[in-house]
Amino acid sequence: KFLTENRDEAVALLRSSIIDPSFSASDIERVRGQVMTGLRSDTTDPDDIAGKAFNAMAFGGHPYATSLSGTMDSVAALTRADLVAAHGDIFAKDRLYVGAVGDITPTELGVLLDQLLGELPETGGPQPKDAEVMIEGGVTVIEFETPQSVALFGHKGIGLDDPDYFPANVLNQVLGGGSFESRLMNEVREKRGLTYGVSSFLLPRDHAATYQGHVASANDRIGEAIAVIRDEWEKASDQGVTPDELRDAKTYITGAYPLRFDGNGPIARIMVGMQMIGLPIDYIATRNDKVDAVTLDDVKRVAGELLDAEGLHFVVVGKPEGLTTGPLPE
């Protein structure tokens, strides 16, 4: 971000950082220390522990199996040569997407991009291949001294480029999409008082997609919370949603969409995201129409194909009573 009057100076500084970064020893050690401090903190965060364990089981030897921050050993071993090589692989014209918003014309932007990116190589290093989601139904318990257990659960999901993504999004809004009106919140929190919060979310990535959820509950009640979640997963898979739930979910999803466009930065990020996924240029104008077009039959069909109560894997971090690593409880 920069003011129009500072454009030339800002672009010159940014160009220097992109084309010829110094990777000075002091900068490398400063950032290395910051990353390693974060990694140490992660070892005491139940949510982070659960997430790393889930990804390791879900993605095996794929890069998605490891944290973006690396490990203590891998970060400690990084050299300046490693950073230079990674920069050469990543910063290339075939790896870049641009979104620009504000006081600039297309012609001016073209000149700016030539100045900023013109010296980059045409192609970068190889991209990771698509990942197979390998996690199977079951429970993994990671002992952690705390009065409350955290559970991250999920199975294979659905990609943003899948024609059934919109029905899946509506389905998730009903099931556990962050609203106090969701089925999971109603059944796990409101009716039984097992948690302060439970949610589910679609997690599509470039090379794989998962459908995940999160719940925290007292150690002596987490088993019951898991049983209720599995029941609701199965009910939605078998029955879909009701007409009222469909209407309310679509109203929420379409009504919340304009709130994403609340500044130049968010708009630019949306434009880049559209390009990365390969969405058409009219996506913003037509997106809510596609949500409104979702029918009860669409949601029921997708629920039956997507939701797999027996395929859910729960990673539980804490001291859960009555739960052990192994198959899902009967």
Where are these regions (language model features)?
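His/Glu-based metal-binding/catalytic segments typifying zinc-dependent metallopeptidases
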Residues: 125-181
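Generic non-transmembrane alpha-helix signal with a bias for helix starts/N-cap capping motifs
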Residues: 181-182, 267
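Charge-rich, well-structured scaffold segments of protease-associated domains
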Residues: 1-124, 141, 167, 191-192, ...
